[in-house]
Amino acid sequence: MRIGLIEFLLILAIASLTVGPRVALFVDRWMRRANRANAMAARRRAEYAAQMAAERDAMLKRFRTASTVFGVGILLVLVYALGFRPIDTPPQIYKAPDLRQETGALQTAVSTDRKTRLELGEYQGVDCIREQDGFVYAAAYNGATLKKRKSDLVRTDGGHAAAILSVEGELTGFAFDAAGDVWLTQLTTAGGTLCRAKHDSWGAAVEQVVTQLDGAPLGAVSAVEVSPAGKVYFAVAAAAGAENGLESALRTELLAHTGTGWVYVYDPADRSVQRVVGGVAGASGLALSPDGRTLYVSDLGNRCVWSMDADARELTAGGKNCQSAFSGLPGYPGALALDEDGILYVSYRWARSSWLEKNADSTLLRGIALRAGRNLQEKLFSLCLLYT
């Protein structure tokens, strides 16, 4: 049976009236469920975003709190380390020495012409030089730190250079006696030592003579001189620790100004050690007059050179029988030398530090500099020249 167009349209109308409401209801329910699902997903996303934001804010807050606590802790540690940490040599209040007075001293220009220089090979530096029998002797060293340093006593005639002896640590000074033996001041991490060395064409033998005083190790030995009578004068820069070398001990004494440097005399005849003069703020150099009667001592912190009778004992720097030969020097004096005419040569380890002497009455600032370490301390002092 064939269905005509009208019948087909009637069937569609009846089907739409019968099924249409159900389809519409199904679509409506599906759309509502979809909307509810979308709304729930949106709420979950919003809740997740809010939770993440809250966690992020909490983390940032904790980080800021931790950063603040860490910063305050670092600040407190820094304040303690620079201002309150105990140190072996607490700074003392002192009166800064006057500026240089007119003493007739002349600045000596040193030529840099290669013809006037003595080459010592691959050594990194020189601590002390002397002339003996037409040869130049130098205490030359290798090694940046005292623990790894090795020092040689090198002899040269301007051409060939040869090491005649070698010691561990720092060879801070040496001098010859009438017999040609060499007296050495040696500094290691264990302390200072006064040594005697005998040398010939076969080699050298080094003997330790003085290693301690009153049961305590020698401190930072800095210089040695031998009198015509054979007595050996040697200086201990200060009570500052010697484990980092002489230069460190002298810088420490400059900042602390403890006045604990001593000059001693050793008599080989009876092997006795006596104190000559104390109260020196950095005993850094010695010299004897040609007749051996007058002893000169460099006082680093007071920027002066003391003179005294070489036979005197138990003196105090600046006290009775200890006069100032030169005061108000332009730098901090180190090694001394006297020629045959009695002219005194003064070398300077550093130029005068205006900051240091401006704070002579401030133990706080100098204490901070002492605790701050080597790099800052080195910036407070600059190299200086040679005066006669």
Q: Which residue stretches match the model-derived regions?
A:
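A short helix->beta-strand "capping" segment at the edge of beta-propeller domains
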Residues: 97-124
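Short loop/turn segments that connect beta-strands within beta-propeller blades
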Residues: 156-160, 198-203, 266-271, 309-313
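Asp-box/WD-like beta-propeller blade repeats and closely related beta-sheet repeat scaffolds
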Residues: 187-227, 235-242, 246-251
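Beta-rich, blade/repeat-based domains predominating
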Residues: 2, 121-133, 167-186, 214-232, ...
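Conserved small/polar residues in nucleotide/adenosyl-binding loops
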Residues: 387-388
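Blade-loop segments of beta-propeller domains
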Residues: 142, 148-189, 210-213
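Beta-strand-rich domains and repeat architectures in extracellular enzymes and scaffolds
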Residues: 114-146
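Residue position within the beta-strands of beta-propeller blades
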Residues: 138-139, 183-185, 234-235, 297, ...
